[in-house]
Structure formats: structure tokens, C-alpha cells
């Protein structure tokens, strides 16, 4: 029983089943760096308040640095009997510097505020890492956007041909999604920038501590103003899980289209052999496994979000052991997101854009129909609904002839309302650049969109 820090209250030792079931060390040892960082800050604060002596602080810092080195070098022995990373580090610290000094580190601190601090430090770091990876992915997309302003391809609604656009315009749509993802992470990071350390178990401490100093040392903007909220809050973890879930919503959509566009039915792009796999039985196969795995991993990150929402949904204040289950999903989602963004960016850098196939695909689906309708409204003063009907008839006649409307030689033979000027509209590049609204597919608009994104990433 002497190995259990709370054994003074109990008359019998914990059952071995309980020790194993209760332990979180195999999961939360990921936080060793954050735990040591938080402990050094806490000890520094205690010394500044006269609670620790200078020589005690020096011994604690030196001992914690040795513990960190042992863990990093793989020399540290993790023992499940220590229950969690906090007690494992504290026990080893006391072995190094003696329990008389090592036992003073936990003054004015509970594991409740300690773990919340460790967890927040990890979450804050993860925000910054993900923002960097998203920035790199946006930059890759911008490089394509600069080169392919005149690479014409079909756009789709309901997976049916809609209107001609450029590949630049298409890839910029995803770049703007990622820009919102960055902003979402920035907003969540700001909300997470409040330190729980010093909240203790749930009601603060009777020691005259300086929480603001701890916040300054650890790089937090401010402290959590309510101790009970400080140890109970896991919004910061939920926010990160949600942000990652939305990132995967966007990357999964992109990957789905990369899968479609690289198929024989489309052949708009070719994925590099370096990022493709083959079949164990079919020699001809070239599979887009990177995209399929990212699409599949989306379910995992969604599940991690739902899991933590469910854990937190009915917990009474303040800390509950249920919250021990908050970390595994975060660790998994963060690693999954980082790995996926890195390989997605690497894969995208090596795709081949098949311009001719994209252009040929525009000759299907009557994609210039809207341009003809707009022409009738603009030049002939015909109400749009009537123009819609007239052009619908043109499409029907083209269908009968087995051609696309872009291949019609004389529109006036179908309806006399069309003149020779209308024939000029049957051109994909003209259609693309005729758009005048902000945010449209025209080259001028695309260039503005590129400038917006470049300005954004330059300020990150």
C-alpha cells in the first residue's frame, strides 16, 4: 500500500484487477514532455512565492531534466503500478533527488489541474502543427492554380456535367476550404489559451500562489478564472476533434474526386506510381490507396469526436474518472490528421494533369446551355424562364442529333431567336471568362482568389 499516494485513507491494498483497469500510463505517457514542462513551471512559481527554497527548485528542475532524458533515450522503466504518467515521473524524481524534496513538487497542485494542463499543452501544440501542415497543402494547391488558369475541365452538380471551369478554379475551391480549417484551428487555439494549473482539485488552494506567473512561463494568454471549470473543461479537446473532423470532411471530398478523376472513366489526372499500389491477382491494376485510406480514416476521426462528446455529455462537476478516456481519441486523431496531411500533400505534388482529357470531357453534357440562356436574357431581353425553355429545346434537338450543343453548326435553324453572335458563345474558354461576378471562374477572378490565399498564408 505504501506505493499508492492515497493509501493513508485505506485499510487494504487495491486489487490487482483494479490497478490494471484503473491505470492510464500506457496512454498518457505520450504527455511526458508536457508533464515535465508543467512541473518545472509549477515549481518555479512555488519558489517565487516562497513555498519552495531556491535549492529545492534547482534540485527539482535538474531531476526532472534527468527524467526527461531517460524517457527520450528509452531508459525509463514504465510500471503500470504507477497508474499514470504524473505519478511515474514523480516517483522517479523522488528516487533521483529524494522524497523529502521530490514530495514537495505537488504542493498546491492536484492531478486534476495537472492533467488538464498537460492535455492543454499537447492540444495547443497540435493546433500549431496542423496549421503548418495545412499551410503547406494550400501552397501546393496554389502552385497548381497559378499554372492551370487555362486548363479547362467540366464542373459537376449531382455528378452531372454543369459548366466549364479551369483546373485552377477547381483546386482553389479546396484551398479555400483549408483556409477555413486554419481559421477554425486558430479560433480554437485562442479559446484553449487559458491555463487550468493552480485550480487544484476543484476549489483552488489555500497557498498564496501566482497562477499568472505559471501562465506566463507556459505560454498561456491567461488563467482559467474558475477553478471548478478549470478542471472540468474539455471543450478544448472537443474543439480540436471537431476541427480535425471538418478537415477530414474536406480532404475526404478531395480524395473521393481524386479517385474518380484518376479512374479510366475520367482520366483527368494520373496519380504517381510512387503513391499507388497494385493488385495481388490483377496485373493491370493501379490503385489510389492513399486517397482511399484518407477517405476511410475519416470515419475514425468522426468516431473520436462522438466518443468524447458522449463521455462529457452528463458528467457532474468537477472531475470524474470518465475523463481519463479523453486522451486516446485526441492522440489518435492528431496523429491520423498529421500523417494524412503529409502524405496527401506529397501525393498531390506528383499528380499529372491530363489537359486534353479534361477538355474533351467538356464536349459532353451540354455545358454551354446556361451561357446561351444568359445570352437570350442579356441581349434579347427575354425573361430567364422563357430563355431556359428555349435552350432546353436546343439541348433536346442536340440529343436527337447525337451531338453536344457545342457542336451545333447553326443555332438559328433550331430557333430563329439566335443570331450569329450567339454562335460565339459555343466556346468553352469564352464561357469561362465571360463570368463577371466576384468569385467566379474567369481568369481575372481566379487571379484575385490566388492573391487572397497568398496574403493569408503569408500572415500565418
UniProtKB/Swiss-Prot annotation:
It is found in: Cytoplasm. GO terms for biological process: arginine biosynthetic process via ornithine; L-arginine biosynthetic process. Gene3D superfamilies: Fumarase/aspartase (C-terminal domain), Fumarase/aspartase (Central domain), Fumarase/aspartase (N-terminal domain). It is an enzyme of class 4 (lyase). Pathway: Amino-acid biosynthesis; L-arginine biosynthesis; L-arginine from L-ornithine and carbamoyl phosphate: step 3/3. Its EC number is 4.3.2.1. CDD domains: Argininosuccinate_lyase (cd01359). GO terms for cellular component: cytosol. It comes from the Bacteria. It catalyses: 2-(N(omega)-L-arginino)succinate = fumarate + L-arginine. Belongs to the lyase 1 family. Argininosuccinate lyase subfamily. HAMAP family: Arg_succ_lyase (MF_00006). This is Argininosuccinate lyase.
Amino acid at each position: 500500500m505504501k506505493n499508492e499516494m492515497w493509501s493513508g485513507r485505506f485499510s487494504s491494498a487495491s486489487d490487482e484487477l483494479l490497478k490494471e483497469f484503473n491505470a492510464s500510463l500506457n496512454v498518457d505517457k505520450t504527455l511526458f514532455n508536457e508533464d515535465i514542462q508543467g512541473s518545472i513551471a509549477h515549481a518555479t512559481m512555488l519558489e517565487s512565492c516562497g513555498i519552495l527554497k531556491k535549492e529545492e527548485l534547482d534540485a527539482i528542475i535538474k531531476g526532472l531534466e534527468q527524467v526527461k532524458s531517460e524517457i527520450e533515450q528509452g531508459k525509463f522503466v514504465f510500471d503500470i503500478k504507477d497508474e499514470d504518467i504524473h505519478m511515474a515521473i514523480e516517483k522517479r524524481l523522488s528516487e533521483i533527488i529524494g522524497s523529502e524534496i521530490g514530495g514537495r513538487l505537488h504542493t498546491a497542485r492536484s492531478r486534476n489541474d495537472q492533467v488538464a494542463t498537460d492535455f492543454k499543452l499537447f492540444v495547443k501544440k497540435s493546433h500549431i502543427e496542423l496549421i503548418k501542415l495545412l499551410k503547406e497543402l494550400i501552397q501546393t494547391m496554389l502552385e497548381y492554380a497559378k499554372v492551370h488558369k487555362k486548363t479547362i475541365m467540366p464542373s459537376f452538380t449531382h455528378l452531372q456535367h454543369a459548366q466549364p471551369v479551369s483546373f485552377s478554379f477547381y483546386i482553389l475551391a479546396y484551398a479555400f476550404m483549408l483556409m477555413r480549417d486554419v481559421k477554425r484551428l486558430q479560433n480554437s487555439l485562442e479559446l484553449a489559451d487559458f491555463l487550468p494549473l493552480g485550480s487544484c482539485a476543484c476549489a483552488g488552494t489555500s497557498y498564496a500562489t501566482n497562477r499568472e506567473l505559471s501562465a506566463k512561463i507556459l505560454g498561456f494568454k491567461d488563467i482559467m478564472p474558475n477553478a471548478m471549470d478549470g478542471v472540468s473543461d474539455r471543450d478544448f479537446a472537443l474543439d480540436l476533434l471537431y476541427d480535425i473532423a471538418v478537415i477530414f470532411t474536406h480532404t475526404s471530398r478531395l480524395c473521393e474526386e481524386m479517385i474518380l478523376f484518376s479512374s479510366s472513366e475520367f482520366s483527368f489526372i494520373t496519380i504517381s506510381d510512387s503513391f499507388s499500389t497494385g493488385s495481388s491477382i490483377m496485373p493491370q491494376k493501379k490503385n489510389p490507396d492513399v486517397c482511399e485510406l484518407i477517405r476511410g480514416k475519416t470515419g475514425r476521426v468522426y468516431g473520436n469526436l462522438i466518443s468524447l462528446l458522449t463521455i462529457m455529455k452528463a458528467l457532474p462537476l468537477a472531475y470524474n474518472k470518465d475523463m481519463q478516456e479523453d486522451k486516446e481519441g485526441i492522440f489518435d486523431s492528431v496523429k491520423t490528421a498529421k500523417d494524412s496531411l503529409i502524405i496527401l500533400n506529397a501525393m498531390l505534388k506528383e499528380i499529372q494533369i491530363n489537359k486534353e482529357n479534361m477538355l474533351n470531357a467538356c464536349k459532353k453534357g451540354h455545358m454551354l446551355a446556361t451561357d446561351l440562356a444568359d445570352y437570350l436574357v442579356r441581349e434579347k431581353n427575354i425573361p430567364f424562364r422563357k430563355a431556359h425553355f428555349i435552350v432546353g429545346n436546343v439541348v433536346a434537338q442536340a440529343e436527337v442529333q447525337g451531338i453536344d450543343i457545342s457542336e451545333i453548326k447553326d443555332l438559328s435553324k433550331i430557333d430563329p431567336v439566335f443570331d450569329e453572335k450567339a454562335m460565339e458563345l459555343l466556346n468553352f474558354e469564352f464561357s469561362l471568362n465571360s463570368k463577371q461576378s466576384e468569385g467566379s471562374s474567369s481568369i481575372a477572378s481566379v487571379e484575385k482568389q490566388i492573391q487572397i490565399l497568398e496574403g493569408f498564408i503569408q500572415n500565418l
